[in-house]
């Protein structure tokens, strides 16, 4: 019998190549999303499923935030913004750079409009010294002082992921299990294999 009593729908947003797919794969525990150094490798929302204790998390891995330059790019940006509808929490994933760009500011404004809890995740902390994170945190706090939490992580090395999952527990809602035990994605197996092959071709 399932012990799941709560669920949380979490959308992961950020610029291309900031590590959204790496984070999704790390939290799920297997590779369901493309990881590539080429931008816009995730074209649709990918649902990852993570069971932790009595809670089931549904992760929405979205395309990267960018200024669209094509019909496909425009569609991908719409996927990002639509993913903020009916979620319990948004993760803004950023690199450890002390600058808040236009894409991040636009997402912050959308989160404020929707009144969605938002966690700032500073990724790739394994590439900088701890002291270098302070100006990054200061820059984002200056842009918006409404983040519900700021959590430094490394999706690659898994550093900080336990802290992140513990924070996400706060936003889970009482309710039924949405996906069966053992299911890690809503994507058909054939589509997952196709996406992973596409990821290899993009490397």
Residue ranges of each PLM-predicted region?
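Conserved, well-folded catalytic cores of nucleic-acid-processing
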Residues: 30, 49-53, 68, 83-90, ...
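Conserved nucleotide-binding/hydrolysis micro-motifs of P-loop NTPases
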Residues: 39-41, 63-66, 96-100, 125-128, ...
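Canonical P-loop GTPase G-domain recognition
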Residues: 116-117, 126-189
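Conserved G1/Walker A P-loop phosphate-binding module
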Residues: 1-89, 94
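Long, well-ordered amphipathic alpha-helical subdomains in the mid-to-C-terminal portions
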Residues: 182-203
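Conserved C-terminal guanine-recognition region of P-loop GTPase G domains, centered on the G4
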Residues: 51, 56, 78-150
